[in-house]
Amino acid sequence: MRADTADYPQLFLEDVPMMDTRAPVEFAGGAFPNVLNLPLMTDSERQKVGTCYKQHGQRAAIELGHRLVSGRTKELRIQAWADFARAHPEGYLYCFRGGLRSQIVQQWLRDEAGIDYPRVTGGYKAMRNFLLDTTRQATAQCAFVLVGGLTGTGKTEVIAALGNALDLEGHANHRGSSFGKRATPQPAQIDFENRLAIDILRKRAAGVGRFVLEDESRLVGSCSLPLELHQGMQRYPLVWLEDSFEGRVERILRDYVVDLCAEFVAVEGPQAGFAAFAARLTQSLANIVKRLGGERYQRLSTLMARALAEQEAGRGVALHRDWIVGLLREYYDPMYAYQRESKAERIVFSGDREAVLAYLRECAAGAVDG
């Protein structure tokens, strides 16, 4: 029989399959990648046992739990756990603290299915704390450089091209702007933090000591950056990415119109997908009405509505350039120009995509200080 483990780095570095025996509501609040929720108790059962524990103590709560999970219900749950164990003989199971729930699942698997399956010592809480420490240690021990630039310069493309970059927007499933929502939901805050920490862990294990990040605000959509990382981003050196105005317009057209529409269509189908895409784009503009001002908003909204109607009629996406041009010139560019001025003393390099990539790769190799 394999022993229980507290080797948290190995679990995440090797993407070991794990069975989470917490209740669904706990799992939804935060979990790890490559984990399947096969709970010992449903949310309702867990609530009843918790109430019993508070009123009558541990022994009564355990007895109630055994009554609630018995007979056919118990058989089906053991079968699900056994199926997972057989499919993933290298895996582990865990509960919140690595205590009673995971021990019961272990015992039932052994007694009823003849399967010895190890658990993670300390459970979810210990693994979560390990990942939080991973991020904190990286911000204290590693070097970081930020990639900034005007909207549409392709900062995300630079991040994707570098092996030592942390894709904050990818982990948050959000493009990081007022128009950044995707067709699929953002992860829970804890899931976002866990994914980021695992990314850091794996890159550090591969020898990365200098990380590249996109210059983001504290919030990437609804996901909040870890405090230590955000504080560091107020002082990290900054590389400024440049591109032509025309190139930026075309990139925004691709990312926020063509690709976003395709995402919605893939999720919801052609008709419903386009309707959802149009509603999302329209709402994104409405979200910044106070910052745009009423007259400017009405003008851009009219241009957007005309472009969406043209697109829905099958006549292409060319008209979207009209509102994109207006939004860049009248809103985003002045805002970013102010931000660049406020961060000017931290800018260590500026250039186009190829020049920035070359500089950042030299930084990663230690050829220049970043």
Curated annotation (Swiss-Prot):
Residues 12-136 form the Rhodanese domain. GO terms for molecular function: transferase activity, transferring alkyl or aryl (other than methyl) groups; tRNA 2-selenouridine synthase activity. InterPro entries: P-loop_NTPase, Rhodanese-like_dom, Rhodanese-like_dom_sf, SelU. The active site is at 95 (s-selanylcysteine intermediate). Keywords: Selenium, Transferase. Its EC number is 2.9.1.3. It comes from the Bacteria. It is an enzyme of class 2 (transferase). The keyword Transferase applies. CDD domains: RHOD_YbbB. Gene3D superfamilies: Rhodanese-like domain. PROSITE patterns: RHODANESE_3. GO terms for biological process: tRNA wobble uridine modification. It catalyses: 5-methylaminomethyl-2-thiouridine(34) in tRNA + selenophosphate + (2E)-geranyl diphosphate + H2O + H(+) = 5-methylaminomethyl-2-selenouridine(34) in tRNA + (2E)-thiogeraniol + phosphate + diphosphate; 5-methylaminomethyl-2-thiouridine(34) in tRNA + (2E)-geranyl diphosphate = 5-methylaminomethyl-S-(2E)-geranyl-thiouridine(34) in tRNA + diphosphate; 5-methylaminomethyl-S-(2E)-geranyl-thiouridine(34) in tRNA + selenophosphate + H(+) = 5-methylaminomethyl-2-(Se-phospho)selenouridine(34) in tRNA + (2E)-thiogeraniol; 5-methylaminomethyl-2-(Se-phospho)selenouridine(34) in tRNA + H2O = 5-methylaminomethyl-2-selenouridine(34) in tRNA + phosphate. Belongs to the SelU family. Monomer. HAMAP family: tRNA_sel_U_synth. Involved in the post-transcriptional modification of the uridine at the wobble position (U34) of tRNA(Lys), tRNA(Glu) and tRNA(Gln). Catalyzes the conversion of 2-thiouridine (S2U-RNA) to 2-selenouridine (Se2U-RNA). Acts in a two-step process involving geranylation of 2-thiouridine (S2U) to S-geranyl-2-thiouridine (geS2U) and subsequent selenation of the latter derivative to 2-selenouridine (Se2U) in the tRNA chain. This is tRNA 2-selenouridine synthase. It comes from Azotobacter vinelandii (strain DJ / ATCC BAA-1303).
